[in-house]
Amino acid sequence: MKIDYLTLFPEMFEGVLNHSILKRAQDKGIINVNTINFRDYSINKHNQVDDYPFGGGQGMVLKPEPVFNAMEDINHNEHTRVILMCPQGRPFTQEIAQELSEAKHIVFICGHYEGYDERIRKHLVTDEISMGDYVLTGGELPAMTMTDAIVRLIPGVLGNQASHQDDSFSDGLLEFPQYTRPREYKNMSVPEVLLSGNHAHIDQWRHEQKLIRTYEKRPDLLEQYPLTEKDREILETYKKKLKND
């Protein structure tokens, strides 16, 4: 996968891209990343990339020329996913991360200032994506977050490719509780089922815990999850237990 970042602050990406999983993915040749300072593509003698909005208003708007010129230098085609980091976009989810992990080429447009000239949005962008209902100074941090979520899903990136399959949201539920040694710590014990060696019982316990944890922390996710009759029984039993406690 090729990943290009159009940004005014390419140095922001150095720390994230040069450590941990993203560094290993580059070392393995699985991803090829490139940061492009679109200020270098300004047609203004002062390298200006923003200007006042037509019609008046607060803040500055990102000019179209630097971004269009930078995109012309990128070897992209109709299959390239050009992502605009934008609070107006669709919320980023694990499902979107999985979808984008199958792309061959992704371009992140990371803006600053009040907003983008609408012609950038209309004529260059394939996807507008938001990290949530809040506003950040620029698109760099969201682009880094998305990159981490996407790249770890590409086959060969993780040491154990199955390790992401139990992550929260991978199947629509939150992840089950995890334990490691010691078996007991400060009078807190590991659930006996995890020590039993009975994998069928362990799988059942983990599924129950995923349902319960999702009900406790993100009940909205259950509205979209295809609950079985057994799942409903588990949740009803848990709700009754809460009432009795």
UniProtKB/Swiss-Prot annotation:
It is an enzyme of class 2 (transferase). One of its GO terms (biological process) is tRNA N1-guanine methylation. Pfam families: tRNA_m1G_MT. It is found in: Cytoplasm. The keyword Cytoplasm applies. The keyword S-adenosyl-L-methionine applies. It catalyses: guanosine(37) in tRNA + S-adenosyl-L-methionine = N(1)-methylguanosine(37) in tRNA + S-adenosyl-L-homocysteine + H(+). Specifically methylates guanosine-37 in various tRNAs. Belongs to the RNA methyltransferase TrmD family. This is tRNA (guanine-N(1)-)-methyltransferase. It comes from Staphylococcus epidermidis (strain ATCC 12228 / FDA PCI 1200). The gene is trmD.
